[in-house]
Every structure is written in C-alpha cells, then in structure tokens.
C-alpha cells in the first residue's frame, strides 16, 4: 500500500524531505531513516508542491496536490546520504525497478542525469539540488523520452 507524500525542499540541508499528506498525518512527525521530521502546518505548505519546477522525467503524480504515489525520493549533492549510500544503491534499485539491468553506481548516475536532469543542467540548477528517484510508479512520465520506462510498474 502506497502512502501519499509531498516533497519539500529543505534549503538549509540541501535535501528533499518527504512529508505525509492527509488528515490523519497532520501534526504528526514523519519518522524515517534520516530521523524524525515534523509535519508542516497547512499554511506552510506550498499548494503547487513543486509544479513550478521544470522537472522533465518525473511522473504526473509528482505534481499532484495529493503528492507523489509509490515514489521514494532521496537527494544529496553526491548521493552520500545514509539512505542511498554507494554500496547499497545498485541493490536497492535492482529490487525496486523494472526495465533496468544491474548497473554500477557510475552508470546509474549517468542514467539519472540523462533521463531526469537535462532541464536542470541547462538552467544551471543541478549543483544546487540533485534528486534521485528510488522506486516506481504507474503514472506516465512528464515529457519523458520514449525509451525511458523507469517508472513503469507491474
């Protein structure tokens, strides 16, 4: 069962936080691998949930007011968080994705950049924040190239 989460950028730490969406989660902290994150008040949450960003390659639900479904976002400048440490990333991706063969971490970084970050590279925003998507979703990609079926799920 997929939880509904909204993504919020924490500029102080340069990471993208996942926050629960829904009446049952308001006011409760979200406890995850990176620690406990308090849910923001409704007035502090942007209503577009990042729709102003040009993120070609993310599925349609990433910009939904309900938040993305069945997606796991982690972000860091060089993929060096406890969630996506280099030694665990290929194994995690192999278990959670379809259509990808087992690849090295370097190959995965190149794959993500080619599929997800073209617009950010052109606008100079890639260094500020890099988003790595670990997981899948049944929604279609936004302006995605035809060969990329990373978000396809069974």
Swiss-Prot record:
Residues 68-117 are annotated as: Mitochondrial targeting sequence. A fraction may be phosphorylated in insect cells and HepG2 cells, a human hepatoblastoma cell line. Phosphorylated in vitro by host protein kinase C or mitogen-activated protein kinase. N-acetylated in insect cells. Keywords: Activation of host NF-kappa-B by virus, Activator, Apoptosis, Host cytoplasm, Host G2/M cell cycle arrest by virus, Host mitochondrion, Host nucleus, Host-virus interaction, Modulation of host cell cycle by virus, Transcription, Transcription regulation. It comes from the Viruses. Its main location: host cell. One of its GO terms (biological process) is viral genome replication. One of its GO terms (cellular component) is host cell nucleus. It is found in: Host cytoplasm; Host nucleus; Host mitochondrion. May form homodimer. May interact with host CEBPA, CFLAR, CREB1, DDB1, E4F1, HBXIP, HSPD1/HSP60, NFKBIA, POLR2E and SMAD4. Interacts with host SMC5-SMC6 complex and induces its degradation. Interacts with host TRPC4AP; leading to prevent ubiquitination of TRPC4AP. Interacts with host PLSCR1; this interaction promotes ubiquitination and degradation of HBx and impairs HBx-mediated cell proliferation. Multifunctional protein that plays a role in silencing host antiviral defenses and promoting viral transcription. Does not seem to be essential for HBV infection. May be directly involved in development of cirrhosis and liver cancer (hepatocellular carcinoma). Most of cytosolic activities involve modulation of cytosolic calcium. The effect on apoptosis is controversial depending on the cell types in which the studies have been conducted. May induce apoptosis by localizing in mitochondria and causing loss of mitochondrial membrane potential. Belongs to the orthohepadnavirus protein X family. This is Protein X. It comes from Hepatitis B virus genotype D (isolate France/alpha1/1989) (HBV-D). The lineage of its organism: Viruses, Riboviria, Pararnavirae, Artverviricota, Revtraviricetes. The gene is X.
């Amino acid at each position: 069962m997929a939880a509904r989460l909204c993504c919020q950028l924490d500029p102080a730490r340069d990471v993208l936080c996942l926050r629960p969406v829904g009446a049952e989660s308001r006011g409760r902290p979200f406890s995850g691998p990176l620690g406990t994150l308090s849910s923001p008040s409704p007035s502090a949450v942007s209503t577009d949930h990042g729709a102003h960003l040009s993120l070609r390659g993310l599925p349609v639900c990433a910009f939904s007011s309900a938040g993305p479904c069945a997606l796991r976002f982690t972000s860091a400048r060089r993929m060096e968080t406890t969630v996506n440490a280099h030694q665990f990333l290929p194994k995690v991706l192999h278990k959670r994705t379809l259509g990808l063969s087992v690849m090295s971490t370097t190959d995965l970084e190149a794959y993500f950049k080619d599929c997800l970050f073209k617009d950010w590279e052109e606008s100079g925003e890639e260094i500020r924040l890099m988003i790595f998507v670990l997981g899948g979703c049944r929604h279609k990609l936004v302006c995605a190239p035809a060969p990329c079926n990373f978000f396809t799920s069974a």
